[in-house]
Design a protein with these regions (language model features):
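Glycine-rich adenosine-cofactor-binding loop
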Residues: 49-65
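A Rossmann-like FAD-binding core segment of flavoenzymes
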Residues: 1-47, 66-161, 168
Length: 198
């Protein structure tokens, strides 16, 4: 071990937008990532389709609808926001209803276009019908997040930076969204606990 090697390392690299390579068109430059939309880095048009109805997608849809956009949201699971804690989900769903956000569930997106998506019925695998939602000004990708410290090819991790760190440092801690994306409160508490115990 080198004398310059640290005694401990905290990996808090955060996360980045999940991009599933088997969905055609997902990397097209016209597709806006949810984080870029929320930060104002990428503007969106009036009529918006949010792809992904988990916590991030649902909150993005509500945010845009609150700002006056005509918003639709599409989700593969059978409900919007199933991963949102119950107390928060009640208010989130009320907001989506209040702002007339159009909701499409049980919809497995197979292709993304600059103005919409094509999808299949996720609840009925025997249904081979390909449906389309088109005519949007902007498509926002909010299917979740993955750790930034790994390199992935699709869903498979092909490089893990932490393994390299462990070779030079005896104590390596991964915290927050670097483990998995979740609420900021959870990530902050985790980082605090690790810092106290080093």
């Amino acid at each position: 071990r080198s004398k310059d090697a640290p005694d401990a390392v905290i990996v808090a690299t955060g996360s980045e937008t999940l991009v599933l390579p088997f969905i055609k068109g997902i990397t097209a430059p016209e597709i806006v990532h949810g984080g870029d939309c929320l930060s104002g880095k990428r503007p969106v048009g009036h009529k918006v389709l949010v792809v992904g109805g988990g916590m991030v997608g649902a909150e993005t849809a509500e945010f845009l609808a609150e700002k006056g956009h005509d918003v639709s949201i599409i989700e593969m699971r059978d409900a919007i926001g199933p991963d949102v804690i119950h107390e928060h989900r009640v208010f989130l769903m009320e907001g989506l209803k209040e702002y007339d956000v159009h909701q499409y569930v049980d919809a497995a997106v197979s292709e993304i276009y600059p103005d919409g998506v094509s999808y299949k019925n996720a609840a009925d695998k025997s249904d081979d019908t390909v449906y389309e939602l088109r005519g949007f000004d902007t498509v926002v990708l909010s299917m979740g997040y993955v750790s930034k410290y790994t390199h992935r090819e699709g869903q498979e991790v092909v490089y893990d930076f932490v393994d390299e760190l462990k070779a030079i440092c005896p104590e390596v801690h991964v915290v927050g969204d670097a483990i998995r994306a979740r609420r900021a409160l959870d990530a902050t508490k985790e980082a605090y606990d690790v810092a106290l115990n080093i």
